[in-house]
């Protein structure tokens, strides 16, 4: 039996501007992640940055695979209104 370990990834998603509709952005992020069958969404919340700009903190569980979080980051960068995606942390789950 092959057991694939999983990784909890904490991402910070920065929008293009503070004028974005954050609820719509979170929904677009959720839809993109759900289209990736290997992702389990653990949580999503807004984090104030400065001058009205907020980051969306996204926590997901993905299989521990070669290439790390690259596919996840690339997929989120495809979402309209997303400017930057940063991996805050990644750790194996038990």
From Swiss-Prot:
Keywords: Elongation factor, Protein biosynthesis. CDD domains: EF1B. Signal peptide: none annotated. It comes from the Archaea. GO terms for molecular function: translation elongation factor activity. Pfam families: EF1_GNE. The keyword Protein biosynthesis applies. The keyword Protein biosynthesis applies. InterPro entries: eEF-1beta-like_sf, EF1B_bsu/dsu_GNE, Transl_elong_EF1B/ribsomal_bS6, Transl_elong_EF1B_B_arc. NCBIfam families: aEF-1_beta, PRK00435.1. Belongs to the EF-1-beta/EF-1-delta family. Promotes the exchange of GDP for GTP in EF-1-alpha/GDP, thus allowing the regeneration of EF-1-alpha/GTP that could then be used to form the ternary complex EF-1-alpha/GTP/AAtRNA. This is Elongation factor 1-beta. It comes from Methanopyrus kandleri (strain AV19 / DSM 6324 / JCM 9639 / NBRC 100938).
């Amino acid at each position: 039996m092959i057991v694939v370990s999983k990784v909890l990834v904490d991402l910070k998603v920065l929008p293009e501007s503070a004028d974005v509709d954050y609820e719509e952005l979170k929904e677009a992020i959720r839809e993109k992640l759900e289209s990736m069958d290997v992702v389990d969404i653990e949580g999503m919340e807004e984090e104030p940055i400065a001058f009205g700009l907020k980051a969306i903190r996204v926590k997901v569980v993905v299989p521990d695979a070669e290439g790390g979080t690259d596919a996840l980051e690339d997929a989120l960068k495809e979402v309209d209104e997303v400017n930057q995606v940063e991996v805050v942390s990644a750790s194996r789950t038990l």
